[in-house]
Structures are given as structure tokens and as C-alpha cells.
């Protein structure tokens, strides 16, 4: 076999090896259309918790291209209406499409002019139906979403989750991505057994900061630059370009770090 024959497939899509260009399988239009079967540019953790006066939600600004930390200024929290924030982990392009859907929903609701405003529970139900419908088409939006806000006439704190399969639930503390393993125990420690009802805004922020610090230390898909949104009956306070202090002296004692003599 010549060198040219060996290198013929270099640089070609893998499907050409099994289904040569022009084959019956490749040109078939009966197969389902799938776009985001394997996400390329992704965001990792989003975390949210209730406190006495409202809800706090945070997400870092990193979008990773595979395992490469590629984009450092991606906002993964979106304001919807007057008292709702939607945070997204997973595929960034799918998240951008969800943002467009939410913008259309806001415009449509505003056109009614009936005095009613979008509530967090309405938005969560809408997103859960959208995600479940796309899952049934075998072309899901590859995201995990957290909807946070103050809901209803009494402005009750509201935090709920929805993912690409249409799975939904609500809890005092929720996280996505690697934060489900690293940060959620700390969030639950602050909120379980109705402790969130006496949790101050300052304590909630301290918990969020500690979670973001742990994620920065331990999650390779995280960044020490994040946004925090606080939703209370008075409105939304959106803080960007936040960071936490970090100390790496402990790394010298970790096996495999730097030049060590074993």
C-alpha cells in the first residue's frame, strides 16, 4: 500500500470512511436531523439557593472548547421579566437559542398589555415543555437550566431545575455541572431543614463565594470570574466580574505538582 493510500482519509470526516460521499445512506433524507449530539463549546456549573429575603444565583464566565478554556467573558445568567433569572450549563449555542425563545416570550407577553407579568414558575414550566419536546424529537437542547426568582403575589423565593430530558424539580438549593458534586453539599448545609428562612443575604453570598472558590480549585472547567444575581421583592441586583481570593501554597504538597523528588 502506498503512502498516498495510507493518508487518503487524513482530514476527512469519519463518516466518509464508512459511508463514502454519494452513498445511499449519506444522501437519505429519512433519518432524524440531529445538531447538538455532542456539544463543543460548553459552560459548567450554575448554583442557586434561597435565603430569607429572596434567591441568589451564580455562574462563572468560562466557555470551554472541549477541554480548552477558550472564552473568558460568556454571561450564562439571563434576566427574564422583572423578577426572574435563568442560568444555563451545557452547550452555549443551545443556550443562545433558548435566550431567543425567552426574548420572544417576553415580547409576546408584553403585547397582551393585560397587566400580568411573567413569573418564575411560568418560565420554568415553559422551558420544561420546550426541553421535553426537543428531547422527543431526538434533537435536544443540551442544557441544564436553573430558574430563580420571587414568585406570585407574595413574592416567595423560587428555585427550580430543568434539563435536556425534561426532568424538573424544585428545591431550596440547586446546582448544575460539577457543582452538583462539589458545591451542592455546602449549599444544602446552609438551606436544608428550612434554614434558608433565617439565612441572611450576607450569609448567602458568603456561601456562594465559598462554593465558587472550591469549584475554581477543583473543577478544570471553572474560572475565577463569575456573575451573581440577587432577586428580592425589590428587584434584581446583577453583579458581574466577581472573583474570590485563592491560595495555592497547598499545591506544593500535592503529588505530581511541579518539580518534586519522589
From Swiss-Prot:
GO terms for biological process: proteasome-mediated ubiquitin-dependent protein catabolic process. One of its GO terms (cellular component) is cytosol. CDD domains: proteasome_beta_type_4. Pfam families: Proteasome. It comes from the Eukaryota. Keywords: Cytoplasm, Nucleus, Proteasome. InterPro entries: Ntn_hydrolases_N, Proteasome_beta4, Proteasome_bsu_CS, Proteasome_sua/b, Proteasome_suB-type. Its main location: cytoplasm. The keyword Hydrolase does not apply. Non-catalytic component of the proteasome, a multicatalytic proteinase complex which is characterized by its ability to cleave peptides with Arg, Phe, Tyr, Leu, and Glu adjacent to the leaving group at neutral or slightly basic pH. The proteasome has an ATP-dependent proteolytic activity. Belongs to the peptidase T1B family. This is Probable proteasome subunit beta type-7. The lineage of its organism: Eukaryota, Fungi, Dikarya, Ascomycota, Taphrinomycotina.
Amino acid at each position: 500500500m502506498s503512502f498516498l493510500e495510507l493518508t487518503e482519509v487524513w482530514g476527512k470526516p469519519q463518516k466518509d470512511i464508512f459511508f463514502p460521499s454519494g452513498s445511499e445512506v449519506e444522501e437519505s433524507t429519512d433519518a432524524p436531523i440531529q445538531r447538538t449530539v455532542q456539544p463543543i463549546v460548553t459552560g459548567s456549573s450554575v448554583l442557586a439557593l434561597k435565603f430569607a429575603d429572596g434567591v441568589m444565583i451564580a455562574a462563572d464566565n468560562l466557555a470551554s472548547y472541549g477541554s480548552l478554556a477558550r472564552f473568558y467573558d460568556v454571561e450564562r445568567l439571563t434576566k427574564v421579566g422583572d423578577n426572574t433569572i435563568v442560568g444555563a450549563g451545557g452547550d452555549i449555542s443551545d443556550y443562545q437559542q433558548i435566550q431567543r425563545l425567552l426574548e420572544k416570550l417576553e415580547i409576546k407577553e408584553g403585547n397582551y398589555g393585560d397587566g400580568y407579568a411573567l413569573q418564575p414558575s411560568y418560565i420554568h414550566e415553559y422551558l420544561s415543555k420546550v426541553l421535553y419536546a426537543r428531547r422527543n424529537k431526538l434533537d435536544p437542547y443540551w442544557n441544564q437550566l436553573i430558574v430563580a426568582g420571587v414568585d406570585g403575589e407574595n413574592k416567595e423565593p423560587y428555585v427550580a431545575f430543568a434539563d435536556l430530558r425534561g426532568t424538573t424539580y424544585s428545591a431550596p438549593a440547586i446546582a448544575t455541572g460539577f457543582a452538583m458534586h462539589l458545591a451542592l453539599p455546602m449549599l444544602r448545609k446552609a438551606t436544608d431543614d428550612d434554614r434558608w428562612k433565617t439565612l441572611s443575604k450576607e450569609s448567602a453570598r458568603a456561601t456562594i463565594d465559598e462554593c465558587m472558590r472550591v469549584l475554581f480549585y477543583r473543577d478544570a472547567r471553572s474560572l475565577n470570574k463569575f456573575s451573581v444575581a440577587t432577586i428580592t421583592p425589590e428587584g434584581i441586583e446583577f453583579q458581574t466580574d466577581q472573583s474570590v481570593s485563592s491560595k495555592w501554597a497547598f499545591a506544593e504538597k500535592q503529588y505530581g505538582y511541579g518539580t518534586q523528588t519522589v
